[in-house]
Regions:
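Ordered, amphipathic secondary-structure segments that act as subunit-interaction surfaces
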Residues: 81-94
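Helix-start/capping segments and mature chain N-termini
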Residues: 1-78, 95, 100-276
Length: 276
């Protein structure tokens, strides 16, 4: 995390923002967030991130005044400049700062906004994948939403790490592949590229959307065992870009030459063009 952050439109020292201890955010994790890649000092796919943030906020009935929401992009650009970021990442979190009615009689309704930035994530060059024993409920109210309730994702990843893996495939209640613990999934069979359908309950990732717009890719519903016959498997997110998996359980993969791995140069070029 960088030295300066933004909390409710004000610059603060990173890590010192204060929230209401009885708020729905603190007690129940009521909030949504998005993580944005920064290339050449510019946030990448900002429009997509803001659209998802607005959509996810509405889904959990978190209502921020339009004027404040519309100022988020400008605030982020100011923070990027202040922290002198060339390449990095940012996280925008909107959370319910209203005290929970279960614990407080009266409270002013409000939505807090925290924006932080950091250097690019460091990812192992030797990524190992397994299958998580923890399933996703595709019919749950938070399915497909990037909410602050990320404990299940973290626990699934911790379980995989305890077994010596870096990430894990998570299936839904029907046994269909949805995603990795903290990323979307893509895989190659021959020259065909695949990814789980949104109907599985997977997150509608912005990087996922960008890939679907720029590559010939089929959205499918398959069981986890289907990926065992894949030629290559990739995980994607704004924080890590595109990373090829080197191993799925005991099976090892050779390096792929698929142009999907050129996503970051493509992203950087598109970011520069949008800034001109």
């Amino acid at each position: 995390m960088h030295k300066v952050a933004l909390f409710n439109g004000k610059f603060i020292e990173g890590g010192v923002a204060k929230i209401e201890v009885l708020s729905a955010a603190a007690l129940f994790g009521r909030g949504v967030f998005t993580t944005i890649a920064i290339f050449d000092g510019k946030p990448f796919l900002m429009d997509k991130h803001l659209r998802r943030l607005r959509r996810n906020s509405a889904a959990i009935k978190l209502s921020q005044p339009e004027k404040e929401f519309n100022s988020i992009e400008q605030q982020l650009n100011e923070l990027i400049h202040l922290n002198s970021i060339v390449n990095g990442r940012a996280r925008i979190t909107l959370f319910d700062g209203t005290a929970s009615r279960m614990w407080a009689n009266k409270s002013e309704e409000r939505v807090d906004c925290l924006i932080v930035t950091a250097d690019p994530r460091q990812v192992s060059a030797d990524l190992k994948l397994t299958v998580s024993p923890y399933s996703i409920n595709s019919r749950a109210p938070l399915a497909g939403i990037k909410s602050c309730n990320y404990l299940e994702n973290l626990m699934a990843k911790d379980e995989a790490k305890a077994r010596g893996f870096d990430e894990a495939i998570r299936a839904n209640e029907r046994g269909e592949v949805t995603s990795a613990c903290m990323a979307n999934l893509f895989w190659l069979k021959g020259d065909r590229l695949f990814t789980p359908s949104l109907a599985t309950g997977c997150l509608a990732g912005t990087t996922r959307e960008f890939i679907l717009e720029n590559f010939d890719c089929r959205e499918v519903t398959v069981a986890a065992d289907e990926l065992r016959s894949a030629d290559s498997i990739f995980i994607t997110s704004a924080g890590i870009g595109v990373r090829q998996l080197n191993k799925f359980d005991e099976r090892e993969f050779t390096d792929s030459a698929h142009p999907l791995l050129d996503l970051l140069p493509i992203a950087d070029k598109k970011t520069r063009m949008s800034a001109e």
